[in-house]
Design a protein with these regions (language model features):
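Beta-strand-rich extracellular passenger or scaffold domains
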Residues: 1-214
Length: 214
């Protein structure tokens, strides 16, 4: 399929105060827009929108993707990570790998049609990916939306990652599982503050999972 547009920041480069609008694919089989920060690059104080897939095709088009790796930092940027527009399609994603850090950035993962935007951290045995002092809000649809079958936004801490001193809120809403934060093998909540919002009548509360050796 067709490749999406791509931005690459390397070797101490910074996005400064830019506005980055990364679009999800709207053609079946295509990739969404991508931005990559590597080798101590920083997102600066930019405003970044990471859109989910815009095409109605199960498992086909992809959402937009932002990747941080090799000591890259999200700086003080603001990220809006959207869910999919149609059932089973790809969501917007932001991922931190190796020794990258979310630093002082703010993230809002939003619910989609049936899957919300995704934020993930995964390091290696020699380098931990961390959330730094980030502010993370995993969103969920409100009861008024009438949606009862979708997943809210989510943050995942996978192998060799840590929430550090981040502030994380998992919103309540009428979704299948609510907004959620997940810790899996060899990850740690460390000194983070996590709030799981309580649901009103008909709502699902926010959820935090600790699995395996987390």
């Amino acid at each position: 399929g067709a490749a999406g547009g791509q931005l690459n920041f390397f070797a101490n480069a910074t996005a400064g105060n830019a506005t980055l609008d990364l679009r999800g694919a709207d053609v079946i089989g295509a990739q969404g827009g991508q931005a990559m920060f590597q080798n101590s690059a920083s997102a600066g104080h930019s405003n970044v929108t990471v859109q989910g897939s815009q095409a109605n095709n199960p498992g086909g088009p992809e959402g937009a993707l932002v990747t941080f790796g090799f000591n890259a930092s999200a700086g003080g940027a603001s990220f809006t990570v959207e869910g999919n527009r149609f059932a089973f399609a790809g969501t917007g994603r932001v991922q931190f790998t190796e020794a990258s850090s979310a630093a002082n950035a703010s993230f809002a993962t939003l619910a989609g049609y049936d899957a919300g935007g995704r934020l993930s951290f995964e390091g290696t045995a020699l380098s931990t990916a961390g959330a730094g002092n980030a502010h993370i809000t995993n969103g969920s649809r409100t009861t008024a939306s009438g949606s009862a079958g979708d997943f809210g936004g989510s943050t995942s801490f996978l192998a060799h990652s840590a929430a550090d001193h981040a502030s994380i809120v998992n919103d309540a809403g009428r979704t299948a599982f609510g907004a959620q934060t997940v810790f899996r093998a060899d990850s740690a909540a460390a000194g983070a503050t996590i709030v799981n919002a309580g649901g009103r009548a008909g709502d699902r509360g926010g959820i935090t999972f600790f699995q395996n050796t987390s």
